[in-house]
Amino acid sequence: MNLPIERYADLLAEKAKNLTALLVPFNPPELEVFESETSHFRMRAEFRVWHDTNEVGENELYHIMFDQETKQRYRVEQFPIANHLINKMMSSLLAEIKGNELLTRKLFQVDYLSTLSGEIAVSMLYHKKLNEEWQAEAAALKARLEHQGFKVQIIGRATKQKIALDRDYVEEVLPVDGRNLIYRQVENSFTQPNAKMNIKMLEWARSCTRHSSGDLLELYCGNGNFSIALAENFRQVLATEISKSSVQSAQYNIEQNGIDNLQIIRMSAEEFTQAMNGVREFNRLKGIDLKAYDCNTIFVDPPRAGLDQDTLNMVQAYERILYISCNPYTLAENLRQLSLTHRIERAALFDQFPYTHHVESGVWLIRK
């Protein structure tokens, strides 16, 4: 797999041109463009595993991917968009499990989750039930990889089954504006794929909100990626999340980073709106006085579909809106309504996914 590194600047310029054109109707300021590293920028990767027999009858294992156009599989020895740690682990893992029936039989996929801090989680997916024998072999594999210098976690997954030998997460450390922020990242949960671009996004969000007054509300905060970084800029932060594992990670991250003004609530945006408006009462809110919060800034990072109409109406009521988008077209659609009441103070492109058409962007909106 060869990357068109020599074309990176042109590809990024094309993304910036297209995003600028989408934002023109809303009279934005000049677009801030944040470029990625040109290789080894991705912190996670997933590969199917192909089983074959060589010319002398030995079983062989390969990482494979599928061509998006032809659907043909191709062998992956090295993966230049993934960080160096993943590439090193790819070859070491296959070398260590080759010929091991317990670890290779019905193994169909391997997922890698790595960090800038040097930790890596390897999730091995099987079409079979995993037993104590598998667990013993996996523990021996972990020990051999650790002997090679890897800080590794091994997780086995099968239908309705998950075995983590030690733990099912890695701990990332991100240097943000001169401070190291600690984030627990659970395997098979969402994390920002381009860690160094994530740092740029966090620093940009912090710079937008630096002189804020009042409190911040974040919808669907995940493991607290943004809310932890932004907490310093606000009196209090209230964040919602529906995933139980993400809430647990967020609570851990809050404690590890010494944040004392951030409250995570496990509920949906719709439920939170009902609670704020006094429509319903929730046991999950016992001990939390919503009236004590003065949330005049809201942070949203919606899925590709953008904000639904009800959430859009709710967001529009806030004085300041920080909107991170993974789909510029739905961002532009949402801005048709938001621009009636708010102006774009700042706009940015974050090249989270080089060499693809995917665009990550951010707008900082202030009420007119």
From Swiss-Prot:
Cited SUPFAM superfamilies: S-adenosyl-L-methionine-dependent methyltransferases
Enzyme class, broadest EC rank: transferase
GO biological process, one term: tRNA methylation
Protein name: tRNA/tmRNA (uracil-C(5))-methyltransferase
GO molecular function, one term: rRNA binding
InterPro entries in the record: MeTrfase_TrmA_AS, MeTrfase_TrmA_CS, SAM-dependent_MTases_sf, TrmA_MeTrfase, U5_MeTrfase_fam
A cellular component term, taken from the record's GO annotations: cytosol
This protein's UniProt keywords: Methyltransferase, S-adenosyl-L-methionine, Transferase, tRNA processing
Chemical reaction(s) catalysed: uridine(54) in tRNA + S-adenosyl-L-methionine = 5-methyluridine(54) in tRNA + S-adenosyl-L-homocysteine + H(+); uridine(341) in tmRNA + S-adenosyl-L-methionine = 5-methyluridine(341) in tmRNA + S-adenosyl-L-homocysteine + H(+)
Record PROSITE patterns: SAM_MT_RNA_M5U, TRMA_1, TRMA_2
NCBIfam families: trmA_only
Annotated function: Dual-specificity methyltransferase that catalyzes the formation of 5-methyluridine at position 54 (m5U54) in all tRNAs, and that of position 341 (m5U341) in tmRNA (transfer-mRNA).
HAMAP family, per database record: RNA_methyltr_TrmA (MF_01011)
Entries under Pfam families matching the protein: tRNA_U5-meth_tr
Presence of the UniProt keyword Ribosomal protein in the record: no
Gene field: trmA
Catalytic activity, EC: 2.1.1.-, 2.1.1.35
Recorded coiled-coil stretches: none
Positions that bind S-adenosyl-L-methionine: Q192, Y220, N225, E241, D301
